[in-house]
């Protein structure tokens, strides 16, 4: 019991869950109401404001709100409090409990973005909007189109990226620099060469996967140069009969003997594979010249002393 005619103060110590404790203090005095009224009451009202938390999902580079990410907020016991898909506006949650910790988790990033790390926050005892931001980085892929050594970028290749449904995602012509792509959605892709540069052989598809990371992911496709070989048939000029055992030397432009060819019973001989051209900075430069010289013939035949020039057409 409180004596009458005294001044008293009422202050809120704890607010209901989801609301902010008011700083308001109410003063009152019990006044004597006469000998017939043993008790005197006093009515008062406190107004509580709900807590307000504003959660932003933004692009790491631009800082703009990023639509399309799947998000949820859980309490310290792992219970889901709210879940939503981000839009071009920040997401607002009211009546989270003051003093409790909550975790914002990205369950699926927007297409072309990387899953962000979860953020944990504590709800403060304030009616002001409490803001928290989660930033997403984009995926980054660097595609190199090189010669077989992997050291020189090859310009002039027509390339295409296909998604898992064989839909074209991007097409370009290679240059002397690697091709850089941002915002490829996480998943599996195929890199396809539609047309090889002059002097190179069309290569097989390269499968790759864009992973959930903001690091640059590198993909390489290598092209081998086209090769050529000399095929010869030696016959009798009059009868057309094949001549077995005739020998030839295949020489380079400086006269160096690369190999000796000897005809078989069908009058046939084939060389090994040789480069058809020189390349400069990955580009076709000059066709390579070879020379075929008959060095040994059969008894009864005249040695052909012609130096036959050989170039390979691409």
Where are the regions a protein language model picked out?
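Solvent-exposed loop/turn and edge beta-strand elements of beta-rich ligand-binding domains
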Residues: 1-314
């Amino acid at each position: 019991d409180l004596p009458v005619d005294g001044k008293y103060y009422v202050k809120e110590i704890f607010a209901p869950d989801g609301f902010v404790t008011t700083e308001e203090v109410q003063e009152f005095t019990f006044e004597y109401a006469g000998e017939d009224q043993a008790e005197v009451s006093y009515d008062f009202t406190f107004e509580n404001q709900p807590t307000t938390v504003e959660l932003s999902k933004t692009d790491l580079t631009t800082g703009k709100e990023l639509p399309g990410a799947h998000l949820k907020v859980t309490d310290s016991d792992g219970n889901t409090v709210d879940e939503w898909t981000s839009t071009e506006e920040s997401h607002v949650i009211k009546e989270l409990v003051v003093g409790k910790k909550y975790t914002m988790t990205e369950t699926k990033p927007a297409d072309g973005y990387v899953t962000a790390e979860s953020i944990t926050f504590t709800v403060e005892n304030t009616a002001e909007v409490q803001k928290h931001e989660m930033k997403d980085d984009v995926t980054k892929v660097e595609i190199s189109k090189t010669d077989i050594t992997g050291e020189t970028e090859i310009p002039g290749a027509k390339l295409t990226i296909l998604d898992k449904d064989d839909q074209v995602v991007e097409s370009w012509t290679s240059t002397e620099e690697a091709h850089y792509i941002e915002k490829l959605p996480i998943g599996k892709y195929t890199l396809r060469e539609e047309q090889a540069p002059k002097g190179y052989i069309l290569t097989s598809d390269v499968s790759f996967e864009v992973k959930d990371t903001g690091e640059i992911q590198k993909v390489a496709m290598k092209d081998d140069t086209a090769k050529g070989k000399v095929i010869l048939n030696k016959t009798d000029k009059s009868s057309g009969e094949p001549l077995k055992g005739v020998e030839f030397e295949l020489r380079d432009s400086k006269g160096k003997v690369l190999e000796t060819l000897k005809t078989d019973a069908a009058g046939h001989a084939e060389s090994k594979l040789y480069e058809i051209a020189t390349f400069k900075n990955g580009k076709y430069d000059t066709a390579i010249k070879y020379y075929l010289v008959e060095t040994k013939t059969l008894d009864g035949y005249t040695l052909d002393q012609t130096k036959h020039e050989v170039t390979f057409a691409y």
